Amino acid sequence: MNTVRVTFLLVFVLAVSLGQADKDENRMEMQEKTEQGKSYLDFAENLLLQKLEELEAKLLEEDSEESRNSRQKRCIGEGVPCDENDPRCCSGLVCLKPTLHGIWYKSYYCCKK
């Protein structure tokens, strides 16, 4: 019975001492991995930031192109009624009261200059 107790005590002491060593080793490994993880996270963050900046630049470029062309897209074409106070006729057209068919409609139309 004493041998069983001594053996059990010896195994218990070895398990505790080796377990503590493993715990310290695990703690050191975890610190190393978190330091490596931080560098990976910084790298990934920088990469993501670059991609987002490129995407933002493309979107702003598309918006500026759209705004340059938007005047011509939103202008009023020839023969379309317009407001004499706020003419939005396309380039080369003027908002005038026509001589013939304007009499019936009492309106201004975009006509060539």
UniProtKB/Swiss-Prot annotation:
Q: What is an example of a Pfam family matching this protein?
A: Toxin_22
Q: Where in the cell is it found?
A: Secreted
The record's account of tissue expression is: Expressed by the venom gland.
**What does UniProt give as GO cellular component?**
extracellular region
Paired cysteines (S-S): C75-C90, C82-C95, C89-C110
Propeptide residues, chain positions:
22-74
Q: What does this protein do?
A: Probable ion channel inhibitor.
Q: Write the protein's name.
A: U11-theraphotoxin-Hhn1s
Record organism: Cyriopagopus hainanus (Chinese bird spider)
